[in-house]
Curated annotation (Swiss-Prot):
Species assigned in the record: Homo sapiens (Human)
Protein purpose: Is a negative regulator of Notch target genes expression, required for RBPJ-mediated transcriptional repression. It recruits KDM1A to Notch-responsive elements and promotes KDM1A-mediated H3K4me demethylation. Involved in the regulation of ubiquitin-dependent degradation of a set of methylated non-histone proteins, including SOX2, DNMT1 and E2F1. It acts as an adapter recruiting the CRL4-DCAF5 E3 ubiquitin ligase complex to methylated target proteins. Required for normal maturation of myeloid progenitor cells.
Swiss-Prot/TrEMBL keywords: Chromatin regulator, Isopeptide bond, Metal-binding, Nucleus, Phosphoprotein, Repeat, Transcription, Transcription regulation, Ubl conjugation, Zinc, Zinc-finger
Name under which the protein is recorded: Lethal(3)malignant brain tumor-like protein 3
Domain of life: Eukaryota
Length: 780
């Protein structure tokens, strides 16, 4: 009896009701923290005395009620009786109390009796007696019906929960429908039967949807507290840590609380910027929706390139935007640019274009700027922040412009505003005694002159007045906030400001090792104020406890402390990490970029993590800034040689420890079990043996394989000796060339359920494709 009573009371616990509220300001007994309720109906810590005074002034002019965590109307506004403002509230001494779990108002057993007013058990409000139902406890027929429907829904929810907790019971028991045979006419009874049948259809539909979303829900439940433990709360956490949240006023509009809900739906089509090639606009599809964030998929490409953005991101646009503004749209894979048509494509895909009203950037007020397309400037290379290079403005949209580095490919381009700290006027490097990286191939690097270069390129410098100074961000050390985890972008975690500089902050994820800290721009859309997740409906990952760090490997199958087995360093989201080599949080992957082939060119990044990802340093090595780059290149080369020598030595020692019966068997085993970590081109004997064992693979580069369709991958698998029957498996799983190159031996054996022998041949063919790609680059 005691347990049931406590559980019942726990269900109806409301954090708002335990606070002391006065003039719109709530205080927690035993605490000095003060709270207010913002426009979203959620709690917000008051950190400024002026802010508290504003709350009191605003409350003095309105009739205030105790708020709810999720303000949801119990019935449509049109169904409620329209009372004068003075009556549409709770009388003094009887505030409206809402459930924190459901967001619905509790039924008050003993409402305050007020002469001339009738209390409604559904609305928990008071209205004129004349306008309420005669002799009833409801203000309207809709309110009475709502209470009845709510009771039935609660019964069904209880039965569904029981079925999910005990699958065996779900096979034995069928959901019961409460059919109340009151004294009604035959017509009313038939109406009830129809309503009950409709409820059954809705119930079955929700069960199917639940099964379909099981994968995502399992991930989202990671943030839910275990049974018997209290739910994590920002207010309690701040008090325990004696910490303060970053004031909401320090966040930019695109970081702060949104004004509208996220209206995007899965399957909607739109146009947007490729974050890895920011000069390229692509056809995108909404793959997932979570709170105020959406996950976007490049049509026709592997889902390993999917990326998350906020619903109000400036880089997404409605269908037809590129055609309207004169921008080039990159069509889906397999479509020709001149043949692509949005209307035809939407009909073919049976898809819906995202409504224009969902795009917040359609109503931006454009501020006059001194920048024009073609103007020159000096800009920081974000991929190598120590480099400041010669750059050009190549595009302008609203209040932003695209920075392109002269004579480099577009993968280094980025969008920025006039106040960006990454851009400087012509001559800034000379004035501040910084080295300016000149365009590759430019003659007379040591005597580079801006005047001469501007004349040669027939261009103008961006005027100094066009560059705006960004004010200090105001973030301070030890302040708390919510940050998107760049290593696993589906997660937003509780974080602390570990350090600051002029325009960046170093974030630390609470409970995690300091090695995961990283710097991020203070105006990045991936940082948010405390409470952003709760207000937008996005799961927030609470700080890791020492116990969770110990138990992580048991639950997630990954040995990395803190990792719950979600996310993958080398491929798409649905393949969880099976080892430290694949875990985005493992030590070996800590400072690496994800190993994906370039989406447009199909080229793989350098195999060795010692080499910088970009080509600019190597290409410009002999032409500009020799003091900086030559030293950097020597360090890289020395590190690479040490790693290679160590790996080769380890490989030879391992081979020497095992003696095979015959030379032929030794050659065969070495060819089959060769690891891609060893530089294959440096071992001609091994390369020769692999080519003999897999003749259909020799000479095919990975860039060509990445463009294969699912049918071509299937045909290739069938061409391998002993793998004829496995081609259909790859076709059924819709594995194209890009996905094929990202597979590991473990994936082929465990996920594809292919025996070890054929799996080794398939995996070695992948290694040979990559080696052939590397050979072709070396020859060039």
């Amino acid at each position: 009896m005691t347990e049931s009573a406590s559980s019942t009371s726990g269900q109806e616990f409301d954090v708002f009701s335990v606070m002391d509220w006065k003039d719109g300001v709530g205080t927690l007994p035993g605490s000095d923290l003060k709270f207010r309720v913002n426009e979203f109906g959620a709690l917000e810590v008051i950190t400024d005395e002026n802010e508290m005074e504003n709350v009191k002034k605003a409350t003095a002019t309105t009739t205030w009620m105790v708020p709810t965590a999720q303000e949801a109307p119990t019935s449509p506004p049109s169904s409620r009786p329209v009372f004068p403002p003075a009556y549409w509230t709770s009388p003094p001494g009887c505030p409206t109390v809402f459930s924190e779990k459901t967001g619905m108002p509790f039924r008050l057993k003993d409402p305050v009796k007020v002469e001339g007013l009738q209390f409604c058990e559904n609305c928990c409000q008071y209205g004129n007696v004349d306008e309420c139902l005669s002799g009833g406890n409801y203000c309207s027929q809709n309110c009475a019906r709502h209470i009845k429907d709510k009771d039935q829904k609660e019964e069904r929810d209880v039965e569904e929960d029981n079925e999910e907790e005990d699958p065996k019971c779900s096979r034995k028991k069928k959901p019961k429908l409460s059919l109340k045979a009151d004294t009604k006419e035959d017509g009313e009874e038939r109406d009830d039967e129809m309503e009950n049948k409709q409820d059954v259809r809705i119930l079955r539909g929700s069960q199917r949807a639940r099964r379909k979303r099981r994968g995502d829900s399992a991930v989202l439940k990671q943030g839910l507290p275990p049974k018997g433990k209290k739910a994590w709360c920002w207010a309690s956490y701040l008090e325990e840590e004696k910490a303060v949240a970053v004031p909401a006023k320090l966040f930019k509009e695109h970081q702060s609380f949104p004004y509208n809900k996220n209206g995007f739906k899965v399957g909607m089509k739109l146009e947007g910027v490729d974050p890895e090639h920011q000069s390229v606009y692509c056809v995108l599809t909404v793959a997932e929706v979570c709170g105020y964030r959406i996950k976007l998929h490049f049509d026709g490409y592997s889902d390993c390139y999917d990326f998350w953005v906020n619903a109000d991101a400036l880089d997404i646009h409605p269908v037809g935007w590129c055609e309207k503004t004169g921008h080039k749209l990159h069509p889906p894979k397999g479509y020709k640019e001149e043949e692509f048509n949005w209307q035809t494509y939407l009909k073919t895909c049976k898809a819906q274009a995202a409504p224009k009203s969902l795009f917040e950037n359609q109503n931006i007020t454009v501020i006059p700027s001194g920048f024009r397309v073609g103007m020159k400037l000096e800009a920081v290379d974000k991929k190598n922040p120590s480099f400041i290079c010669v750059a050009t403005v190549t595009d302008m949209v609203d209040n932003r412009f695209l920075v392109h580095f002269d004579n480099w490919d577009e993968s280094y381009d980025y969008w920025c505003e006039a106040s960006s700290p990454h851009i400087h006027p012509v001559g800034w490097c000379k004035e501040h005694r910084r080295t300016l990286i000149t365009p590759p191939g430019y003659p007379n690097v040591k005597h580079f002159s801006w005047d001469k270069y501007l004349e040669e390129t027939n261009s103008l410098p961006a005027p100094a007045r066009a560059f705006k100074v960004k004010p200090p961000h105001g973030f301070q050390k030890k302040m708390k906030l919510e940050v998107v985890d760049k290593r696993n972008p589906m997660f937003i975690r509780v974080a602390t400001v570990a350090d600051t500089d002029d325009h960046r902050v170093k974030v630390h994820f609470d409970g995690w090792n300091n090695c995961y800290d990283y710097w991020i721009d203070a105006d990045s859309p991936d940082i948010h104020p405390v409470g952003w997740c709760s207000k937008t409906g996005h799961p927030l990952q609470p700080p890791l406890s020492p116990l969770e760090l110990m138990e992580a490997s048991e639950h997630g199958g990954c040995s990395t402390p803190g990792c719950k087995g979600i996310g993958h360093f080398k491929r798409a989201r649905h393949l969880g990490p099976h080892s430290a080599a694949n875990c985005p949080y493992s030590e070996i992957n800590l400072n690496k970029d994800r190993i994906f082939p370039d989406r447009l060119s199909g080229e793989m990044p350098p195999a060795s993590p010692s080499f910088p990802r970009n080509k600019r340093t190597d290409a410009n090595e002999s032409s500009s800034s020799p003091e900086i780059r030559d030293q950097h290149a020597d360090d890289v080369k020395e590190d690479f040689e040490e790693r290679t020598e160590s790996e080769m030595r380890t490989s030879h020692e391992a081979r020497g420890a095992r003696e095979e019966p015959t030379v032929q068997q030794a050659q065969r085993r070495s060819a089959v079990f060769l690891s891609f970590k060893s530089p294959i081109p440096c071992l001609p004997l091994r390369w020769e043996q692999q080519s003999k064992l897999l003749p259909t693979v020799a000479g095919i580069p990975a860039s060509k394989v990445s463009k294969w369709s699912t049918d071509e991958v299937s045909e290739f698998i069938q061409s391998l000796p002993g793998c004829e029957e496995h081609g259909k498996v790859f076709k059924d799983e819709q594995i194209d060339g890009e996905a094929f190159l990202l597979m590991t031996q473990t994936d082929i054996v465990k996920i594809m359920s292919i025996k070890l022998g054929p799996a080794l041949k398939i995996f070695n063919s992948i290694l040979m494709f990559k080696a052939a790609e590397k050979n072709s680059h070396n020859e060039l």
